Structure formats: structure tokens, C-alpha cells
């Protein structure tokens, strides 16, 4: 493993070097090390991964710690950073093994002697906190080793730059490791720690600005896109302590331009402008005008504005970039919903929203923004208002027409919120019908296969039930077949008409005076319910009420029977089907003779189906056993 790993790390190919680093990281990630592969019963031994004896483990960890020290002092910045990060991440895990502690301390000292190891200092402090401070009231807790206290003092940042690297320019979230005197108690402990660390970052920024240090000493970390949450406060501190704001601004921009484009984060710039605004607002406006012209800062222009006061002048500055082809519309989303933008005239916000719809993916930005605006607002309040509701449903129509792919369902959530807020209030009647027509136009186009935006479609059916049901049975024969397929549910996809109240379904079916629609609508009703893990499966009350209201219960029961077989399952399919069959079998004793008679006939067919399925599974199992023999 060491030979292969070293070959990868020494490779000229970036992907192989990354693979070598990952091998090094996983080598220190156990035990246990879990094996991957086929573990089914058979003639081969199962692979449970490497399970070393204690002596083997010590030898293993010694070898890989030596490699980490070699890489961490190699003089190659990329390798040094990776090695130092890995050992910091694994320090607390490795410290549990007493026989390796002296090796671990020696490695920490070597890395720190090469250059200050702030990540290691935080790793040591978190080890002290979790293994000792947090467990101080436990009887079986190990006394705090003096050698660990000594190591913590040795690794603690002693100069300004190393302190900034540890407190500000590090992506580790060891809140408990950064303030030894803080009592980590109470429901607000993390927000309190954040306040302390923000104040610390501001102070460090001020001290750095008044010092003789240059910004190049903090790069590239100062602008790395790597989740360092205190750089805004650090930027504020820089502005607060800068002897000359203009000159320091120019130095910041120069250092930003020297960094690789893909790695740039402008949080420090944002903090600098925000503090400048509190010192000299006219200068802050001048800096923002420069940002609008900068090749990189223009992409973050909205976020660079001080949030305490966002004016129409600021909006004009931001919107002046909107028609540029390389500007992403996501930058503007917060303006539509954020409290810090609430002082803007409604007409200007509507203008922005309307223009966003003409941008690529602008419809998604509008939907997500309006969803955020609706967050935590009561359903009875018309938060959006007529104009924003019009834009919101237009965004939904535009996005749904474009494609119906929504991996993860996040956009479906946003669209469902906007559609719900639009359909529940009067007005927008033309847009509501256009939205409904769009749904079925897309259904027709995709032959009834729509597996995204289920919640948005479902809430539409709930608010416009009669119109929704009527659309299913409108159109040509081909269109009706596609739409009936669309409402037919299975175990993995709920039918949109399942969101419609069963009383409305029954009333609508009765008004059509067409007995055949009952069976079609029945295909979308949720059938099975279960009170607890040990309780038997039974028909849902809504399904039973629909069956009892139907003029032809046999046809409805036949549809129910089609949903006895699961669309996916683990183990025996017959075992999944059996309790569902028994749920239908309970209807044999129904008080109505027509339902009882129909249930008996359907139950007999289903019982035969289950027996055939059991036989098929038995033959399949025998074949597998013979193959093993």
C-alpha cells in the first residue's frame, strides 16, 4: 500500500496525486476498515476489512505518520497543506491509542518546527475538550496528561500571522477549541461562541492593518474558496485599522488578482466595504462602482453591498450588469426576499423579477426567492401580493415547460410553495388556467411519464380538483391514455389526485354520470394503511368510502387488485403481496352484498396469484442453491 501510495503522490498527474492523498487519509481512518465487495454467502471468505492486532496497528500507524511528517515538511505547499490537514483531522482519533501518543507528539513538534501548525493546535485543544473537559464529571475519565497540556502550549500561535491563520483562515469548525475559558453550556452556546470568534477576527484584522505585515503573507488563504466563516469580520477589521482606506483597498484588489480564478472567495472584500461604508459612505460607493467594473468582483456585486442600507442607486448599479451574458441570475435572488432589501420600492423589485425571467435559469431564481419570502409566513397572509403571484406562477409555467428534471426535489419544494400561495387567493385566474394547461401539455408531450415536481402538481390538484379531474378525461383517446397513466400511482410515486379530498372525488365522479370514470380515478387513490409495525395492513378509509360510493364496486376492486404487487421490494415479493391480499379479503364480510360478492371473486384471483408467486420464488431459490452446490 505504501509503495502504491507513494507512486501516486509522486505522479505528475493531479488526479493520481489526489488518489494518493486519499489513500493516506483512509490509512489513518481506522480501525475498523470496512471492506467493499460481494459479501453474500458462498464458497469464498467474506471480506470484513483489515482487522490488525494491536502491535500490527501500532506498526501501521507509525509508518503512515512518518509519511505524513515527510510530506508535511517537504517544501511542496500543496503536499504540506494536505499532510497537515490529515494529521489534524485524525489527531483525536489516533490519540485514543496509548502506544502511539509519543509518536504523535513527536510528529506534531516536527510539523510545528517546520512552520506554525495552527490546525494541530486546534486538534490538541479539541482533544483536551472532548476527552477531558467535557467528561470531567465522569468517574472513569482519564486524568489530563501533562504532555498534552505542554504540547498545546507549544503549538499555540505566538505571532500575529499564525494567529490569523488559526482563528480566521482555517476551515475547521472547532468552536470549542478556540476559547478555553468559555463555558460550553446552554442552548445559545454556538451563537455565543460565534460572537466571540467574530470579535476576535475583527481585532486580528485591525492589528494586521496597523502592523508592518503585507497581505501577501496571508495568501492564498485570504481568498481561498474553502468555507472560512470569519473572513467578513476580518475584512471589517482591516478597514477599521487601515491607515489609508484607498491604498489598502488597492492592495487587497492586487492580491485578489494574483489568485487563481477558481479559488477566489471575496468575503474579506465584502467585510472591507461594509466597514468602509460606516467610516466613509461616499468612498464605499466609489469602491462598489469599481467592483462593478472588476473582472471578478462583478460576479459578486450584490453580496458586496452593505446590507444595512441598500438603496435604489445600489439596485441600479447591480441591474446594470443583468444583461451581460456572463452574469448569473442567482446573484439577484436575495433582492426579491431579503429583509435588508425591503426598503426598495415594490415597482423596482417587480421590474427585477420580470427581467430575471428572461435570463437563463432566471425562473428558478424567482421561484426559490419567492419561496424564501414565504418562509415562516402564515397561510392566511397574502405575503406575495397579486403582482408577485403573477410573476411566480409565470416562473413556474416557464420552468415546467423547459424540462421536468429536479434531482433532489429542492426546486419542487419552492415551486409548490409559490403555487400554493397563488392558488389559495382570488385573482390570477387566467394564469391559474394557463398553469393547469401547461401541466397536461407536458404530460401529453412525455407520454404521461412525469416524475418530478410531484408536490407542485399535487397542490394544484388539491386547489383546483374539478378542473384537474376534467382535464384528465378531455382530449383525444391518446391524450386520455397518457393522462390516465399519469395519475396511476405505485409504491414509489404518489398520484397527484391523492391530494384531492375523497368527498370531492366522489362528488365529481357522480356528476360525470359515466360509470367508467370511477375505476380510472380509483387508480390514483392511496390504498394501504398500517397503524404500527406489528399491526396488519388494511384498506385506507378513503379507499373504502370511494369503493362504497362507486356504482360498480367490482371494477374499482379490480383496480385495487392491480396495486397489490409492489413496484419494488426486498426479499420475497409474495410476502409483501400477502397482507395486501388479506386486506382486500376482509371485504368478503362486507354488509353490502354486491361488495362482498365482488371482493370474494377478486380475493380468490389474488390468492391464486400469490401462490403462483411463491412457487416461482421457490423454483428460483432452488436454482440458486443448485448453482452454489
Residue ranges: model-predicted function:
Residues 1-629:
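Non-catalytic all-alpha helical scaffold/repeat segments
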Amino acid at each position: 500500500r505504501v509503495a502504491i501510495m507513494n507512486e501516486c503522490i509522486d505522479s505528475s498527474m493531479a488526479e493520481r496525486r489526489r488518489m494518493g492523498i486519499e489513500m493516506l487519509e483512509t490509512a489513518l481512518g481506522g480501525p475498523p476498515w470496512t471492506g467493499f465487495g460481494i459479501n453474500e454467502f458462498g464458497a469464498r471468505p467474506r471480506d470484513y476489512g483489515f482487522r490488525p492486532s494491536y502491535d500490527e496497528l501500532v506498526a501501521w500507524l507509525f509508518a503512515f505518520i512518518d509519511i505524513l511528517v515527510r510530506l508535511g515538511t517537504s517544501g511542496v505547499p500543496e503536499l504540506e497543506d494536505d499532510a497537515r490537514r490529515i494529521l489534524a483531522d485524525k489527531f483525536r482519533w489516533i490519540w485514543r491509542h496509548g502506544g502511539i501518543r509519543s509518536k504523535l507528539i513527536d510528529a506534531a513538534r516536527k510539523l510545528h518546527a517546520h512552520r506554525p501548525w495552527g490546525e494541530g493546535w486546534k486538534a490538541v485543544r479539541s482533544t483536551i475538550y472532548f476527552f477531558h473537559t467535557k467528561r470531567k464529571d465522569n468517574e472513569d475519565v482519564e486524568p489530563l496528561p501533562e504532555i498534552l497540556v505542554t504540547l498545546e502550549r507549544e503549538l499555540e500561535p505566538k505571532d500575529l500571522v499564525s494567529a490569523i491563520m488559526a482563528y480566521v483562515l482555517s476551515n475547521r469548525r472547532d468552536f470549542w477549541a478556540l476559547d478555553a475559558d468559555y463555558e460550553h453550556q446552554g442552548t445559545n452556546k454556538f451563537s455565543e461562541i460565534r460572537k466571540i470568534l467574530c470579535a476576535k477576527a475583527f481585532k486580528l484584522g485591525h492589528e494586521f492593518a496597523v502592523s508592518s505585515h503585507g497581505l501577501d503573507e496571508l495568501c492564498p488563504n485570504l481568498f481561498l474558496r474553502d468555507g472560512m466563516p470569519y473572513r467578513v469580520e476580518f475584512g471589517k477589521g482591516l478597514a477599521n485599522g487601515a491607515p489609508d482606506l484607498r491604498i489598502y483597498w488597492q492592495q487587497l484588489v492586487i492580491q485578489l488578482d494574483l489568485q487563481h480564478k477558481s479559488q477566489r472567495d471575496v468575503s474579506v472584500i465584502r467585510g472591507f466595504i461594509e466597514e468602509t461604508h460606516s467610516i466613509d459612505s461616499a468612498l464605499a460607493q466609489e469602491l462598489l462602482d469599481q467592483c462593478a467594473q472588476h473582472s471578478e468582483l462583478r460576479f459578486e456585486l450584490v453580496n458586496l453591498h452593505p446590507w444595512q442600507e441598500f438603496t435604489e442607486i445600489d439596485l441600479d448599479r447591480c441591474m446594470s450588469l443583468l444583461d451581460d451574458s456572463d452574469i448569473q441570475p442567482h446573484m439577484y435572488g436575495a433582492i426579491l426576499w431579503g429583509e435588508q432589501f425591503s426598503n426598495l420600492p415594490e415597482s423596482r423589485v417587480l421590474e427585477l423579477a420580470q427581467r430575471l425571467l428572461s435570463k437563463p435559469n432566471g425562473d428558478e431564481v424567482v421561484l426559490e426567492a419567492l419561496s424564501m419570502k414565504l418562509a415562516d409566513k402564515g397561510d392566511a397572509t397574502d405575503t406575495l401580493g397579486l403582482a408577485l403571484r403573477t410573476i411566480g406562477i409565470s416562473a413556474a409555467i416557464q420552468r415546467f415547460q423547459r424540462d421536468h428534471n429536479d434531482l433532489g426535489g429542492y426546486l419542487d419544494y419552492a415551486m409548490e410553495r409559490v403555487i400554493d400561495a397563488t392558488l389559495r387567493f382570488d385573482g390570477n385566474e387566467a394564469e391559474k388556467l394557463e398553469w393547469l394547461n401547461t401541466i397536461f401539455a407536458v404530460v401529453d408531450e412525455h407520454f404521461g411519464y412525469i416524475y418530478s415536481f410531484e408536490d407542485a402538481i399535487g397542490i394544484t390538484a388539491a386547489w383546483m380538483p374539478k378542473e384537474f379531474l376534467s382535464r384528465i378525461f378531455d382530449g383525444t383517446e391518446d391524450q386520455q391514455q397518457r393522462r390516465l397513466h399519469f395519475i396511476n400511482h405505485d409504491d414509489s410515486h404518489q398520484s397527484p389526485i391523492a391530494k384531492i379530498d375523497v368527498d370531492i372525488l366522489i362528488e365529481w365522479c357522480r356528476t360525470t354520470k359515466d360509470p367508467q370514470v370511477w375505476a380510472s380515478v380509483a387508480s390514483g387513490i392511496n390504498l394501504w394503511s398500517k397503524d404500527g409495525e406489528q399491526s396488519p395492513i388494511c384498506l385506507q378509509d378513503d379507499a373504502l368510502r370511494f369503493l362504497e360510493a362507486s356504482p360498480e364496486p367490482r371494477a374499482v376492486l379490480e383496480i385495487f387488485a392491480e396495486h397489490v404487487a409492489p413496484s419494488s421490494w426486498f426479499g420475497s415479493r409474495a410476502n409483501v403481496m400477502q397482507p395486501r391480499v388479506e386486506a382486500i379479503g376482509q371485504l368478503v364480510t362486507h354488509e353490502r352484498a354486491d361488495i362482498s360478492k365482488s371482493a370474494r371473486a377478486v380475493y380468490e384471483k389474488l390468492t391464486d396469484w400469490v401462490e403462483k408467486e411463491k412457487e416461482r420464488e421457490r423454483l428460483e431459490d432452488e436454482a440458486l442453491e443448485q448453482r452454489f452446490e
